[in-house]
């Protein structure tokens, strides 16, 4: 069944499948950006490079050797003021300290992380833009969250055994 205003994507990972429903009505810029990266094959063969138990799993920017992937698209406008919340199972855009710097990296919340929500349109209050939620495969997300991590300078919380996004695809 196709839901109005929803784009469904499938992340095929080395630990199983994660199906995500993107909210193109409340997060149109972010959804379009994510879909462009998927359609270009950008996420294929990337890793979840940051795994913090009881917080987030993050991916979308590193190769298996931890080198950064070259991004083709410009950073996007932060849509964290869209009313969607950083709650368990939601997907949001990672960014730098600059509120409008999100590009390809994303994270899935492992718990309700309401401190990441939008509170004001200031550098400290912008928050992290939620643009969808896991609809199937939260068990896979939890399996990723339980993986052993270590340090890969300058990064911490890197899975000791790489967890790959083998393929990302838009599905209907």
What are these model-derived regions, one by one?
Residues 1-172:
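Cyclophilin-like peptidyl-prolyl cis-trans isomerases
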């Amino acid at each position: 069944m196709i839901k109005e205003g929803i784009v469904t994507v499938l992340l095929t990972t080395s630990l199983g499948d994660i199906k995500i429903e993107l909210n193109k009505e409340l997060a149109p810029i972010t959804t379009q950006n994510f879909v462009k990266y998927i359609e270009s094959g950008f996420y294929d063969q990337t890793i979840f490079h940051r795994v913090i138990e009881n917080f987030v799993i993050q991916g979308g920017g590193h190769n298996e050797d931890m080198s950064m992937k070259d991004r083709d698209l410009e950073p996007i406008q932060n849509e964290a003021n869209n009313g969607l919340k950083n709650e368990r199972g939601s997907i949001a855009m990672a960014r730098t300290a600059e509120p409008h710097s999100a590009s390809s990296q994303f994270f899935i919340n492992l718990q309700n992380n309401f401190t990441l929500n939008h509170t004001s349109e200031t550098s400290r209050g912008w928050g992290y833009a939620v643009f969808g939620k896991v609809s199937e495969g939260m068990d896979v997300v939890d399996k990723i969250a339980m993986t052993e991590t270590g340090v890969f300078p300058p990064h911490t919380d890197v899975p000791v055994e790489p967890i790959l996004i083998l393929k990302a695809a838009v599905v209907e």
